[in-house]
């Protein structure tokens, strides 16, 4: 039964390293990996491609149901995301896509449409689920729960370095403002607001290296 499959949820705001840590932990454990944020970004991209009005909830919900999302691992180990059979990985990573996804994610009907799809990732031997409400809404019965945090300034700095490496010119101050605005949207939305589960392990990654965070998370599962 699916509910007997172990699940590790790693929640937290943007830029705390959820994705990086989750992928490493999933690989070490040999478990499946769910990037829930990619699903919302995929819906955002599909909505943009088909000119869906984000204020039209009915159209957005239909888009969420109709959008086909597949994760394909390349020979180099990198995960590519296909949206309706089109490789949209690079588009999904754009800041504008993230902002649109955050707006869409605040709509309860869209979250409901994607809930079952996320739960279907729960397969043997186990699942590492990365998101904002994995431990509180999607997998409230998960055996292991982590909530990652980090100061907004540090998260902006990390994102700035990532974008600079890719040759994307951006202002650090603008990134910081965007992160704070997204935090406010995520924490204040009426449906599935961003918050740690009562039984989650809290980890502040502000002054930590990735391997240190990974070690703490793995210890939760293996000890």
Curated annotation (Swiss-Prot):
Catalytic reaction list: CMP + ATP = CDP + ADP; dCMP + ATP = dCDP + ADP
SUPFAM superfamilies assigned = P-loop containing nucleoside triphosphate hydrolases (SSF52540)
Which key words tag this protein in UniProt?
Answer: ATP-binding, Cytoplasm, Kinase, Nucleotide-binding, Transferase
Q: Name one GO cellular component term.
A: cytoplasm
Set out the biological process GO terms recorded for this chain's protein.
pyrimidine nucleotide metabolic process
What is the name of this protein? Cytidylate kinase
Q: Does the keyword Transferase apply?
A: yes
**One Gene Ontology term of the molecular function aspect:** ATP binding
Q: Which Pfam families match?
A: Cytidylate_kin
HAMAP family, A to Z = Cytidyl_kinase_type1
Q: What is its EC number?
A: 2.7.4.25
Task: List locations, semicolon-separated.
Answer: Cytoplasm
């Amino acid at each position: 039964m699916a509910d007997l499959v172990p699940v590790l949820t790693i929640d937290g705001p943007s830029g705390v390293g959820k994705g990086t840590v989750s992928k490493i932990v999933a690989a070490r454990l040999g478990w499946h990996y769910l990037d829930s944020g990619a699903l919302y970004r995929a819906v955002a991209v599909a909505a943009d491609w088909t000119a869906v009005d984000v204020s039209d909830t009915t159209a957005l919900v239909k888009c969420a149901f109709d959008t086909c999302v597949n994760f394909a691992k390349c020979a180099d180990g990198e995960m590519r995301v296909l949206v309706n059979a089109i490789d949209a990985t690079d588009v999904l990573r754009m800041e504008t896509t993230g902002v649109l996804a955050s707006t869409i994610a605040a709509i309860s009907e869209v979250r409901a449409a994607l809930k079952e799809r996320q739960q279907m990732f729960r397969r043997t031997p186990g699942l590492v689920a990365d998101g904002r409400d994995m431990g509180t809404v999607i997998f409230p019965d998960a055996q292991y729960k982590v909530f990652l945090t980090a100061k907004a300034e540090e998260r902006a700095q990390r994102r700035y370095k990532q974008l600079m490496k890719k040759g994307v010119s951006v202002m650090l101050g603008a990134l910081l403002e965007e992160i704070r605005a997204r935090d406010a949207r995520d924490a204040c939305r009426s449906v599935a607001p961003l918050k740690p589960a009562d039984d989650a392990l809290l980890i502040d990654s502000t002054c930590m290296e990735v391997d240190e965070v990974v070690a703490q998370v793995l210890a939760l599962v293996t000890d």
